[in-house]
């Protein structure tokens, strides 16, 4: 699949600490026909001086808003919900039972998965969880300490029924 198309909007993050470079960049053109794993992307704007291997480029054009409501997550061996969108997100009115990993996993990973960006403007409320640590936040960074990655996350009015 093509990761970038002309006109797409891109944010740039440091691979070491997940900090975001200022600005949103617009794809001008791409060359995907290199070796099935390399893409050359040209931007309309001038990029700041950088070593490309130290940064990841996230195409934010198709990042969705997320609403998960009225669902039951039961007997799932992995996580219930994995959220990595920077758009509006709301998870409410759900029941989580016997989920093997975190019920809700808020990730940001520039080390292994590459498509995982930070969460912004998220609400988690009025859910019922069956374990005491149901929500996991994990920016996976190469350096410590970790800078703020996720922002404006509100967690309230949930029930934890062990």
What name fits each language-model region?
Residues 1-34:
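Ser/Thr/Gly-rich low-complexity blocks that favor extended beta-strand/coil architectures
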Residues 12-24, 44-60:
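C-terminal effector modules of nucleic-acid-centric enzymes and ribosome-associated factors
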Residues 59-65, 73-75, 82-85, 96-97, ...:
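Low-complexity, polar/charged sequence tracts that form flexible coils or short amphipathic helices
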Residues 77-84, 100-107, 131-137, 162:
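Short glycine/acidic-rich loop motifs that flank beta-strands on beta-rich extracellular proteins
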């Amino acid at each position: 699949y093509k990761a970038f198309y002309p006109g797409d909007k891109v944010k740039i993050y440091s691979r070491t600490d997940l900090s975001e470079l200022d600005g949103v960049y617009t794809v001008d053109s791409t060359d995907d026909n290199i070796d099935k794993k390399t893409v050359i992307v040209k931007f309309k704007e001038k990029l700041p001086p950088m070593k490309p291997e130290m940064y990841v480029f996230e195409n934010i054009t198709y990042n969705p808003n997320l609403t998960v409501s009225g669902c039951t997550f039961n007997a799932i061996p992995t996580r219930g919900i994995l959220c990595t969108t920077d758009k509006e997100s709301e998870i409410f009115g759900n029941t989580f039972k016997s989920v093997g990993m975190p019920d809700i996993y808020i990730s940001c990973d520039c080390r292994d998965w590459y498509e995982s960006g930070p969460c912004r403007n998220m609400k988690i409320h009025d859910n019922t969880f069956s374990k005491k640590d149901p929500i996991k936040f994990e920016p996976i960074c190469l350096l410590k300490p970790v800078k703020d990655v996720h922002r404006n996350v509100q967690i309230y009015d949930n029930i934890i029924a062990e």
